[in-house]
Amino acid sequence: MQPATRSIAVAGPASAALRTATTPFICLGCRSVQRKQQRRLFSSTVSTQTDLRAGLTKLTSRRLISVSGPDASKFLQGVITNNINAPHNANGFYTGFLTAQGRVVHDVIIYPDDLGPEPGKQSFLIEVDADEAATLHKHIKRYKLRSKFNLKLLDPEERALYHSWNDVDQAGPWTKLIDEVQNAGNARAVPDPRVPAFGSRVVVNQTSSSSPLTDGDLTPESSYHLRRFLLGIPEGQSEIISGTALPLESNMDVMNGIDFRKGCYVGQELTIRTKHRGVVRKRILPCILYYEGAAPEIPADGPGQLEALEKLLKPEVEQGVKAEMIPQGASIDKVDKKSRSAPGKWLRGIGNVGLALCRLEVMTDTVLPGETPGTYSPEQDFVVSLGGEEGSEVEAKKVKVKAFVPFWLKDVWRIEAEKAEEERRMREELLRDRGLDVE
C-alpha cells in the first residue's frame, strides 16, 4: 500500500512563486519518535562565509508552547526572570525559568501570539529547546494550579520558527519573501531580543491555506549555530545546563533576559543578591580550537569582528578531530599545569569553534569590577581533552582552546561601567549639597 500523501505549497527564497511538493503523511506519535532520534543539530561541514553573513534557516532545534487565557500574563510574570508587562517587551523578549535556588531550568523567548485564534487577548508563545519542550510543558502544567489559561505544546506542523539575518549592505533574497508572508498575515518577524544585529525570529502559521516558507533552498541550521557560537550566545539545555547553570554566568543578564527591578519570581533571591553583592567570575564565552602553534589572533572589537572571525573557521581542528568530539563538561585547563580547579568547562561546538564556561580573569584579559588584574597571560595556552580517563593506557587526544570576549559584550560592560560611574558621581554631588562628607 502506498503511503498517504498531501499537497503543500512551497516558496523558494529568491521568488514568491509557488510550486507543488508531496510529502508522506506521518502521525504525531511517529513525528515525536523521529524528533528524539534526530538530536544531532549540526552538519559535518562548516558553512560558507556567505551563509554566515546573510541567510534564512528553519530552527528545528526550537519548539513553541501556547499559553492563552485570562491568567496567562499573571502566571508567567511569577515564574520568569523578565518583566512581561514592560513596554519594551511588547514585541517579544528573552527570559528564563529558574529553580527556587536560582538555577536555570529553561531559557526561552516569549512572543505575543498575534497569529492565534484570539490575537492580543492574553495569548503568548514560548520558544524553548525542542528536546525539552515536553518537559517545560509539564513544568507549567504542574504549577498552573487554579490559574485560568490554556496550555498547548504546538506541533511544528502548526507553527514553525525561522531565523533570518543580513550583515551585508544590500537587501537579502529573503527580505521580500518575509515581508510578503507578514503582509499576508501568515507570519510575524521580530528582532532577536538577545544581541543587537543578531537577526530576526520569524514565527510562521503553518495552518494557513498555503505554507509560506518551506525547507527548500534555506540556509543550513548549522550556519545559525556557528553565528551564535562566534557571538557567544548560548541557547538550549546543551549549553545552559538545566538545574546547574546560573543565569548571570549564562549571560542572561547581558542578553536582556533579566529585569532586576520586577517583583517576586521563582529563583529571584539568589539572582538579585549576585547582581548587587557578588562578582560574576565566570561566563559563557566563544572559543576557537587549534592544535599546534600560536593561538589564533582574535580580530579587533567592533561590528566587523564577526566577519573577520569567519576567516578562522575550519571544518576540523586537524584531520579527524572536530569540536563535536569533545564531551560536554570536559575540563579546560592550563597546558602542563593542573589548576586546583579547572578555569573552564567545554559546552558545545562545531568544526573548530564552540562555547565554554570560562573563568574571566584566568582565560581572558578581563579585569573584574573593583579588583586588580587576574592571572591571565597571553602566552598561557589552555587545553581540553577529547575524552578518556586519566591513567588509562591510551591517553586522550587534546586540543588547545582560545577563549575571547565578543565585541557586543564588551560594549555592554562599557555602558554599565559608565552608568555606574555616573550614578556614583551623582551620589557624591547629593552628599556635598547636603553638607555631608564624601568617603
From Swiss-Prot:
Locate the coiled-coil region(s) and give their ranges: none
Q: Write out the similarity annotation.
A: Belongs to the GcvT family. CAF17/IBA57 subfamily.
According to the record, the segments passing through the membrane are: none
Got any disulfides in this one, which pairs?
A: none
List, in alphabetical order, the GO biological process terms annotated in this UniProt record. iron-sulfur cluster assembly
Q: What is this protein called?
A: Iron-sulfur cluster assembly factor IBA57 homolog, mitochondrial
Which portion of the chain is the transit peptide? 1-72
Keyword list, A-Z: Mitochondrion, Transit peptide
**MF GO annotations:** transferase activity
Q: What is one Pfam family matched by this protein?
A: GCV_T
Classification via SUPFAM superfamilies: Folate-binding domain
Q: Where in the cell is it found?
A: Mitochondrion matrix
> Which is a Gene Ontology cellular component entry for this protein?
mitochondrial matrix
* Gene symbol of the encoding locus: caf-17
Organism of this sequence = Neurospora crassa (strain ATCC 24698 / 74-OR23-1A / CBS 708.71 / DSM 1257 / FGSC 987)
Source species, domain of life: Eukaryota
